[in-house]
Amino acid sequence: MKQQLLERFLSYVSFDTQSDGQNQNVPSTHSQFVFAQHLRQELVSLAFEDVQLSDKGYLTATVPANVEGVPSIGFIAHLDTAPDYSGKNVSPQVIENYNGEDIQLGLAEVLSPKQFSSLNQYIGQTLITTDGTSLLGGDDKAGIAEIISALHHLLTHPEIPHGKIRLCFTPDEEIGRGADHFDVESFGAQWAYTIDGGQVGELEYENFNAATAMITATGNNCHPGTAYGVMVNAQTIAARFHAKMPLKDTPEHSRDYDGFFHLLGMEGVTEKATLTYIIRDFDLELFEKRKQWLTELVEKYNADLSIGQLTIDVQDSYLNMKQQVLPHPHIIDIAKQAMQNLGIEPIIKPIRGGTDGSRLSYMGLPCPNLFTGGHNFHGKHEYVCVESMVKATETIIEIAKLTAEHK
């Protein structure tokens, strides 16, 4: 299984599948569709049933049940890699029997346990790293490799009891659109798991409540030589507004269950400037208070302006899946038991972000998140442990077995 996973993963990361938040096409990049076509051919060759690729880039397939009266479950991963860092020409390095020392990434970069202490737990194991010029793509091609490997194992080992199992590989998860065209009804699962987490044992069923606030400053432009008493610089209005935001209520000062405001972007000219904030909190009441506080701050700032104006538009992005998952405790219990059966200690912690599962849970498909075995996603220091990928694959198989007992 280990060698098969390694080869499968190395094949997948050769596809550049970065998504593009500026492109409104679905998927946002054609390369994701090319990768999905490759996976479709692989699934057909492996004798998966009902293999379908939609024109939106959603790839689904089925492992038929071999026992009756068992809930249908699903496993989900995403095709795209983050637009944050280059995903072109990925040249993975395979480090066998890691010795605990610095790993040279190509010519100019280093992956060091002094900076990334998580490396220390993988001495003697096989790591896959970047060459320092791109991200690796473990997020989420490790998840794809693990799902296909696990479900193919079930197909070729009919002595393992399981119900109907569905898989889906989605486009554009990294830009928040992975669930936009997901057909929950046709997927036909009672619950599912995204395979999109990090270190071994991660089991996540809480995520941020999330919103985006667009604040627009309106000014008045004229020739700077005749600007006295006439010019109103929208950029100055925007900058002074941001100076009123709390300095410590930001991502770099928050952790665990802390929420935050994050200035994601600012741009403008004299006539018009925009500030884009993301708002995050795990607690729904505090989340609503954050949105209200920001709206009231804009109103107060406008009242103090003699000229110029700010407007605000707040849009919710996704909500904490906890409210949709906890009413179905067996979904979590089965995943925990599967890990424990394999000698894995479950690590239950909140996702300081979102997944396809957070939106799918509110679309009627409760969907916690499980580990892939990767670290340092979205950058040149990303790496994956192959032995951890094996454990993720075994966890998927064990979940299928335990679900067959849950009648």
Curated annotation (Swiss-Prot):
It catalyses: Release of the N-terminal residue from a tripeptide. Its main location: cytoplasm. Cleaves the N-terminal amino acid of tripeptides. Binds 2 Zn(2+) ions per subunit. It is found in: Cytoplasm. Pfam families: M20_dimer, Peptidase_M20. Its EC number is 3.4.11.4. The active site is at D80, E173. This is Peptidase T. Zn(2+) 2 binds at D139, E174, H378. One of its GO terms (molecular function) is metallopeptidase activity. It is an enzyme of class 3 (hydrolase). Its cofactor is Zn(2+). Belongs to the peptidase M20B family. Zn(2+) 1 binds at H78, D139, D196. Keywords: Aminopeptidase, Cytoplasm, Hydrolase, Metal-binding, Metalloprotease, Protease, Zinc. InterPro entries: ArgE/DapE_CS, Bact_exopeptidase_dim_dom, Peptidase_M20, Peptidase_M20_dimer, Peptidase_M20B. One of its GO terms (cellular component) is cytosol. GO terms for biological process: peptide catabolic process; proteolysis.
